[in-house]
């Protein structure tokens, strides 16, 4: 009987230890996709990348029939929910398509460690980066659980792009993806240039003719915690969206954040500009329409009485075009509170219920229902909708369909462009707000 109990108790260990090593992935010939349903198969993507000496052009993926598929043709489809645990190295292998197929990848307390002896720029997420010269598509995927980024051993300055999906997404499309991942970051020194988002750290296009599109429901429900910080672009969904190409967020799309952002600044940080937004930290793009960005998460910032300049908005910390082109925001909504602990000492810090710093835009249906709570000394650029007008990005128009439902501050601050004004709206706008 004792021997029987011992065998039963050890069975899970034996099953795990005897699991066959992955040497190839099953390839569905009918659909022309690799099928993945195990953690070991996800990790195999990195093992393959390392074997190929990290030469991106030489990357291929081996099928279970012995055929090599070039990386720019690799399409992956999840066939089961997957749970990842322990230390995680973000996937470096470039894929053309990653189809979640309605499944969930759960991070079970995973840790990503930033080592002292390693490089100076890091991309952290399920993937390190996606897209590039060849576009990537990610669709119908849910990410859940929690991820800790540990940089406490680091002594030298470095840059970090982080999101549950990818640190960087350069070119392609993200469609119907949800993150429920709680992300926490700590380095104890505040020596990092930090760009975290709930889903993607940095959303960028590879060149002026390249497009990045968000489609369907793009949702973050995870909380983001940063401590300490000294130079940052922080967003509930995307940390930074900036390019010289086009980012399409319009029509049949809704980008939503429902997670809280909690940020503590480094007390002796340099007086640099930093950006915090409920949906996007910094949004800087060429002429385009931007539609249906919604935030329900709270933003909590402890300034530690630093002299840093903050641009903070319930939806975007800053929203401006590149150069002197124009952008056309429609249906930007905030219901989350912005809570500032300690003083805002920098003269040009800007806080808006929806957007912190703005310029070169025509605003329709910008709505705020969240409170701005400043416990210490405030700044002169605090507004119910739009914090402060940028001095270098042309005039703006705020249409009458825009409203601050709290009413504790002026709707916006304008001082640079004499033709910037509020104007009547005659449109009958649809809305994706719940």
Q: What residue ranges belong to the model's regions?
A:
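C-terminal motif of bacterial Sec signal peptides marking the signal peptidase cleavage site
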Residues: 15-17
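Sec-dependent signal peptide recognition
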Residues: 2-8
């Amino acid at each position: 009987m004792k021997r029987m109990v011992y065998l039963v108790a050890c069975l899970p260990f034996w099953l795990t230890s005897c699991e066959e090593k992955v040497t190839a992935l099953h390839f569905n010939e009918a659909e022309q996709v690799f099928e993945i349903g195990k953690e070991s198969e996800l990790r195999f993507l990195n093992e393959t990348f390392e074997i190929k000496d990290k030469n991106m052009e030489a990357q291929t993926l081996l099928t279970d029939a012995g055929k090599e598929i070039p990386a720019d043709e690799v399409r992956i489809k999840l066939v089961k929910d997957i749970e990842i645990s322990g230390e995680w190295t973000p996937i470096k292998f470039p894929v053309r398509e990653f189809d979640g197929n309605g499944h969930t990848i759960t991070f079970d307390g995973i840790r990503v460690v930033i080592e002292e002896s390693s490089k100076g720029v890091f991309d952290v997420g399920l993937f390190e980066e996606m897209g590039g010269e060849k576009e990537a598509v990610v669709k119908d995927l849910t990410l859940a659980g929690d991820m800790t980024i540990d940089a406490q051993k680091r002594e030298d300055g470095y840059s970090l792009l982080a999101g549950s999906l990818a640190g960087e997404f350069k070119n392609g499309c993200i469609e119907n993806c949800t993150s429920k991942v709680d992300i926490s970051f700590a380095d104890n020194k505040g020596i990092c240039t930090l760009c975290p988002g709930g889903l993607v750290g940095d959303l960028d296009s590879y060149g002026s003719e390249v497009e990045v599109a968000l489609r369907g429901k793009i949702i973050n429900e995870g909380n983001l915690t940063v401590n300490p910080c000294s130079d940052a672009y922080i967003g509930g969904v995307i940390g930074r969206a900036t390019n010289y190409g086009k980012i399409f967020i319009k029509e049949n799309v809704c980008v939503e954040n429902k997670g809280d952002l909690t940020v503590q600044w480094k007390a002796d940080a340099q007086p640099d500009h930093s950006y915090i937004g409920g949906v996007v930290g910094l949004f800087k793009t060429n002429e385009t329409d931007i539609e249906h960005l919604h935030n329900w998460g709270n933003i909590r910032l402890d300034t530690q009485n630093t002299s840093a300049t903050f641009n903070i908005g319930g939806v975007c910390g800053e929203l401006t075009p590149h150069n002197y082109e124009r952008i056309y925001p429609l249906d930007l909504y905030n219901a989350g509170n912005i809570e500032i602990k300690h003083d805002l000492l920098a003269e040009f810090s800007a806080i808006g219920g929806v957007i912190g710093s703005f310029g070169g835009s025509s605003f329709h249906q910008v709505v705020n229902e969240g409170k701005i709570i400043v416990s210490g000394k405030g700044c002169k650029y605090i507004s119910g909708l739009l914090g402060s007008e940028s001095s270098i990005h042309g005039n703006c128009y705020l249409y009458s369909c825009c409203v601050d439902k709290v009413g504790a501050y002026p709707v916006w601050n304008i001082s640079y462009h004499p033709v910037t004004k509020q104007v009547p709206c005659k449109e009958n706008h649809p809305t994706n707000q719940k």
